[in-house]
Amino acid sequence: MNAAKASVRPAPGRHNAWEIAVHAAYWKYAAWRRLTAEKRGMFARPGSNWFASPTPPTEAAWREDVALLVRYHRQLRAAVAGLRDGDLDRRAAGGRETVGRLVRGIAAHDLYHAGQIQLLKRLLR
């Protein structure tokens, strides 16, 4: 997917694939932070949750945001890979849920948004 396609909105007021990708990166970061007890405020973009895609879209900015998604995905995978069975039942840092529930939740979140992006790609064919 190129920058132009990633920035197409399926309808006015709806998120495009670019915004969904950065949103997914943010929540991978948030889950990683809670798994590792890192401090807040270290995400690569100011703000939280949803981030506007740049206007006009550029390939360089798109590649940068895809790299951001990959980076936070790898960080999260490394944190999850380092968990032991006993860790799954302990409370995640900064919340009421367990580590196991946090991991299942971020996996479900990722799948949901990956599906959205696949649907957007089909709409753009």
What are these regions (language model features)?
Residues 52-90, 101-106:
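Acidic/histidine-rich alpha-helical segments that form the ligand environment
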